[in-house]
């Protein structure tokens, strides 16, 4: 029988509800419990797939091909549970499903309202997403008091009553600001945030108080008194040197004991030695490298959240401090490749649209001609193919049809047909909707023996996640291969190019898939580990 921990946030947004939830989940998992996590997003978009990275940050792709909130990336990095499309849903998705049922006549002519129809659909999705887990942590996006969050909070209130207090807890994150002129932390914002929650029928069981300064015992006692929360359930969570320390911080304050006692669960003690190892390797590196990351969304680094974390994980595995030099590809176009001087490796991540593409192509040329280790991901592979066609084959007009539909040598084009993660055939044209029409989710890839990528994975067949609608044009592939471009990975059916490598280069790998989505701090990822090792070798520190 599943128990539920509902996680809300107050005072301000971006307090780290996702990381706090994932950290608690990691402790409970370490105690031997089966864990799952859900993220409920209050926005009207059906999913974040077509939202600007500048507004929403990264779109995290699940194993089954769902385009979801970046918090699901945090979940998968902290726990071993694999997330699916059931672990994230939005207001838009809920309303779409309810309206579809109304059109079918499922409500038998009833007046469709927020209560009960919308709240019932939210509750149904929460229960479905929880599955057979021992504990499901359910994070509600936004801040208490937001008008968009009201249906979700009402659904939680109802669900707590329906399943009973012994199966439901509410954990509320708040901000306890430090006022430098007064020299003290202030509890009033937390008091008001809890008052707002209680006004809609929700009493927190646990308060996680975020602060950039220590919260003393008297402040915690005051918070407990005014919010009707046990003093030991007022958890102080200061800023830390690495997010992977947070499980230990929460465990030291007994948060997992509070949960286990409340739910009456029988389980062992938490073994956090894996997390201790991660923190030690992260904070005590033995060497360091500098890697240039050339992208087009550098104003909001959350657009590359999983990728940045994957580079950190690779550093943890080899006890290497990975210094990322963030470079906007438009700056390369305006200032030239001198911005890349002095780096030990170059990384070009994915992206959409024409802006900044020529800067990425110049970056690839610089890496290839100067024998600097290069890793291209998604668009980073496509620009590698375009660069090779232009500067090795001499096709000066080579391009992708995404950027130039009249190109005489469209070496990258729209995929018109493929199989999705379920095995069903998908067909797309230029006129297809942008939302939900890409090649998404886990796909098999066959690796060629004797290649760099095969050396990294040490496998003939791998499974990685995809998010793209353009691919290498098979009609021009023979000329590319004849000119030396190495095709080191193909889709499971052999129809699509998945990985390319440049000849006569110490380490040049470009892949169509997104390996960052499966990298974790405890296990790392073979491709990123190979990339960092290549950077170490290039710098002479291997």
UniProtKB/Swiss-Prot annotation:
PANTHER family: CTP SYNTHASE (PTHR11550), CTP SYNTHASE-RELATED (PTHR11550:SF0). The active site is at residues 378, 514, 516. One of its GO terms (molecular function) is CTP synthase activity. Residues 290-541 form the Glutamine amidotransferase type-1 domain. CTPSs have evolved a hybrid strategy for distinguishing between UTP and CTP. The overlapping regions of the product feedback inhibitory and substrate sites recognize a common feature in both compounds, the triphosphate moiety. To differentiate isosteric substrate and product pyrimidine rings, an additional pocket far from the expected kinase/ligase catalytic site, specifically recognizes the cytosine and ribose portions of the product inhibitor. It comes from Pseudomonas aeruginosa (strain ATCC 15692 / DSM 22644 / CIP 104116 / JCM 14847 / LMG 12228 / 1C / PRS 101 / PAO1). Belongs to the CTP synthase family. It catalyses: UTP + L-glutamine + ATP + H2O = CTP + L-glutamate + ADP + phosphate + 2 H(+); L-glutamine + H2O = L-glutamate + NH4(+); UTP + NH4(+) + ATP = CTP + ADP + phosphate + 2 H(+). Mg(2+) binds at residues 71, 139. Residues 1-265 are annotated as: Amidoligase domain. ATP binds at residues 14-19, 71. The keyword Transmembrane does not apply. L-glutamine binds at residues 351, 379-382, 402, 469. Keywords: ATP-binding, Glutamine amidotransferase, Ligase, Magnesium, Metal-binding, Nucleotide-binding, Pyrimidine biosynthesis. Allosterically activated by GTP, when glutamine is the substrate; GTP has no effect on the reaction when ammonia is the substrate. The allosteric effector GTP functions by stabilizing the protein conformation that binds the tetrahedral intermediate(s) formed during glutamine hydrolysis. Inhibited by the product CTP, via allosteric rather than competitive inhibition. NCBIfam families: PRK05380.1 (NF003792), PyrG (TIGR00337). Pathway: Pyrimidine metabolism; CTP biosynthesis via de novo pathway; CTP from UDP: step 2/2. CTP binds at residues 13, 146-148, 186-191, 222. Disulfide bonds: none annotated. The gene is pyrG. This is CTP synthase. PROSITE patterns: GATASE_TYPE_1 (PS51273). UTP binds at residues 13, 186-191, 222. Catalyzes the ATP-dependent amination of UTP to CTP with either L-glutamine or ammonia as the source of nitrogen. Regulates intracellular CTP levels through interactions with the four ribonucleotide triphosphates. GO terms for biological process: 'de novo' CTP biosynthetic process; CTP biosynthetic process; pyrimidine nucleobase biosynthetic process.
């Amino acid at each position: 029988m599943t128990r539920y921990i509902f996680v809300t946030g107050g005072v301000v947004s971006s307090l780290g509800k996702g990381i706090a939830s994932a950290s608690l989940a990691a402790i409970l998992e370490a105690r031997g419990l089966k864990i799952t996590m859900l993220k409920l997003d209050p926005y009207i978009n059906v999913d974040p797939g077509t939202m600007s990275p500048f507004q929403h940050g990264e779109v995290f792709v699940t194993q089954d091909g769902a385009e979801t909130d970046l918090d699901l990336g945090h979940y998968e990095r902290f726990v071993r549970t694999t997330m699916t499309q059931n672990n994230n849903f939005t207001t838009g998705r809920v309303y779409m499903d309810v309206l579809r049922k109304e059109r079918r006549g499922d409500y038998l002519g009833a007046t469709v309202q927020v209560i009960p129809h919308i709240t019932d659909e939210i509750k149904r999705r929460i229960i479905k997403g929880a599955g057979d887990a021992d504990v499901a942590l359910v994070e509600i996006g936004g801040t208490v008091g937001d008008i968009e969050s009201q249906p979700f909070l009402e659904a939680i209130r109802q669900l707590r009553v329906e399943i009973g207090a012994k199966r439901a807890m509410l954990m509320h994150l708040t901000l306890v600001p430090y006022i430098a002129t007064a020299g003290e932390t202030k509890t009033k914002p937390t008091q008001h945030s809890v008052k707002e929650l209680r006004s809609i029928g929700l009493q927190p069981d646990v308060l996680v108080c975020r602060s950039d300064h220590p919260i003393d015992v008297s402040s915690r006692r005051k918070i407990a008194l005014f919010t009707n929360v046990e003093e030991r359930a007022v958890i102080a969570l200061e800023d830390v040197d690495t997010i992977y320390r947070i499980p230990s911080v929460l465990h030291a304050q007994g948060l997992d004991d509070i949960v286990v006692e409340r739910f009456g669960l029988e389980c062992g003690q938490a073994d956090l030695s894996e997390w201790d190892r991660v923190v030690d390797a992260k904070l005590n590196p033995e060497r360091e490298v500098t890697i240039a990351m050339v992208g087009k969304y550098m104003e909001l680094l959350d657009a590359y959240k999983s990728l940045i974390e994957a580079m950190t994980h690779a550093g943890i595995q080899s006890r290497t401090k990975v210094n990322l030099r963030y470079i906007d590809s438009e700056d390369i176009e305006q200032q030239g490749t001198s911005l890349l001087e002095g780096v030990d490796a170059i990384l070009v991540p994915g992206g959409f649209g024409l802006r900044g593409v020529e800067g990425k192509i110049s970056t690839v040329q610089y890496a290839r001609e100067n024998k600097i280790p290069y890793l291209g991901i998604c668009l980073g592979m496509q620009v590698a193919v375009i660069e090779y066609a232009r500067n090795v084959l001499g096709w000066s007009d080579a391009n992708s049809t995404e950027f130039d539909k009249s190109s005489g040598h469209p070496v990258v084009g729209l995929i018109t047909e493929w199989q999705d993660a379920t095995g069903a055939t998908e067909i797309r044209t230029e006129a297809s909707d942008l939302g939900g029409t890409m090649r998404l989710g886990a796909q098999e890839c066959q690796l060629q023996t004797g290649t760099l990528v095969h050396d990294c994975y040490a496998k003939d067949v791998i499974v990685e996640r995809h998010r793209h609608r353009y691919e290498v044009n098979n009609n021009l592939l023979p000329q590319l291969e004849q000119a030396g471009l190495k095709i080191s990975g193909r889709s499971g059916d052999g129809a699509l190019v998945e990985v390319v490598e440049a000849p006569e280069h110490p380490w040049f790998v470009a892949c169509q898939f997104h390996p960052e989505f499966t990298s974790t701090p405890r296990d790392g990822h073979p491709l990123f580990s190979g990339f960092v090792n290549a950077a170490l070798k290039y710098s002479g520190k291997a």
